[in-house]
Amino acid sequence: MSFSQFGYPYNATSQFFVSATPSTTCCDSISRSVTEGSSASQTAASFCCPSYENRLLASTRTELNAALGMYGSPYAAAAAAAGQNYANYFPYSADPSAIYSSLNPQYEIKEGSGSLHSTITQPATYYPYDHSLGQYQYDRYGTVDFNGSTRRKNATRETTSTLKTWLYEHRKNPYPTKGEKIMLAIITKMTLTQVSTWFANARRRLKKENKMTWSPKNKAGDDRKEDLDSKDSKDEQDLQFSDLDDMEDEDCDKLDSDCEKSGQDDLPTSSPPKRDCNPDIPLHSNFPSFPCGLKSLGPLNPDYLDHLGSKPQQQQPSPQSTSINTVALSHFESSEKPRIWSLARTAAAGVVLGTQHVGDVRTGPVDCQMQGVRLPTVGAVQCGELKGLQDPTNLSNTESLFQEGLQGIHKAYSSGSFKTLQLHSSSYPGLTESCQYSSMEGFPSAGKTETESSELSDTCPTIQEAKTTAFRPVMKR
């Protein structure tokens, strides 16, 4: 009997040999004829057939009969015979240990293997991280719900109170580490994402409410260092400026104290009028010397200030010289003749000063020195105004001249005489060969007019011999 459609002959005897004893292996050598194309050869093969349980073989036998029944009666009879042969040669043992004892020694099972086919009970599970997952058992596929879908969805007041407590304790640095976040997540039964989000929102809320007591964490250390360096440099710069201000104040105080001391020394003296601060060069002492502090000249007319502004820029007066200025101005303010007052203003704008030795030119500072008592009125041009600055060593002489001028300035001025003087000032580039100098002289005593006029006429030749160049007044404000 053969099934040519299957490609191999079917013998009446079974090709499967299963030993009756389950302890031995079921590997037997049999002969099998296989037709390959036109030739057929008999080959010997070894088949190993394991033992099966009754419930497995019963189902396979019925399925085999149903499958072979479609081929008609001849095949159905063969299928029935084959099913009977299978049933005869397979042992049906209720003991499952007989199945595993037939395996090779390398697959031996320990004692108690019979419990494998008993009902499977759920073993106790071990959770290494989160104990809250221990109450959830494995599902039918053996997986665990690690997504936290069964955990708390939103934070309650109890959980947020724990987080708020930690935030208050660490308000100087409200950035919890990874371990602290894990600890807080376990305590509050929240996820790490929820804890991190809560702290981020809390920091943003505190920053918006201007309750920030920590330095931003995202700011690099170099930026912090640069900020500190800039603050230190700014403090040092302010310190240097304050030191400079202190030094200037000290210098001004020293200078003012020297001026006051020299003025106090010269007050009680009643020495005769000196001709010059420098004994080598004769200088006229006919014009009174009085300091004109610009700060104390508030009530003066603006044209007088313009005359002062037309003069070259000179040294600023010391702040403490106002006490002497008030003494000088009190005489002018108490004067009842506005004409004399106007003469004094004009004389202050165009005062003629003496020369220094060999090119050293001397011009009074803001003290506005006027040598002697005579008050000239400048006519067309100014002749004899020289450039230069007063030496600090001449402060005492200046104060003495000022005191001498105070003694005669309050006297009533007698009638003046008008004279025209020829002053040869060829050294000044803007002038002609001779300059007209009209002066109105007011003098307290008679008999000095001619001598003082001659002294004034000798001034221009002296200037020309000394080769000193008069400078042009420049407006500086």
Curated annotation (Swiss-Prot):
SMART domains tied to this protein: HOX
Organism: Danio rerio
Signal peptide: none
An example Gene Ontology CC term for this record: nucleus
Residue ranges of the annotated DNA-binding region, renumbered to this chain: 148-210
Bias (Basic and acidic residues) ranges: 219-237, 254-264
Region feature (Disordered): 209-282, 303-323
InterPro entries assigned: HD, Homeobox_CS, Homeodomain-like_sf, KN_HD
Known function: Transcription factor. Binds to the iroquois binding site (IBS) motif of target genes to regulate gene expression; functions as a transcriptional activator or repressor. In concert with irx5a, plays a role in visual performance.
Alphabetized GO MF terms: DNA-binding transcription factor activity, RNA polymerase II-specific; RNA polymerase II cis-regulatory region sequence-specific DNA binding
Compositionally biased region (Acidic residues): 243-253
Record-linked CDD domains: homeodomain
Protein name: Iroquois homeobox protein 6a
Keyword NAD on entry: no
Keywords noted in UniProt: DNA-binding, Homeobox, Nucleus
Gene3D superfamilies listed in its UniProt record: Homeodomain-like
Compositionally biased tracts (Low complexity): 310-321
Primary location: nucleus
Example GO biological process: neuron differentiation
Subcellular localization, as worded in the UniProt entry: Nucleus
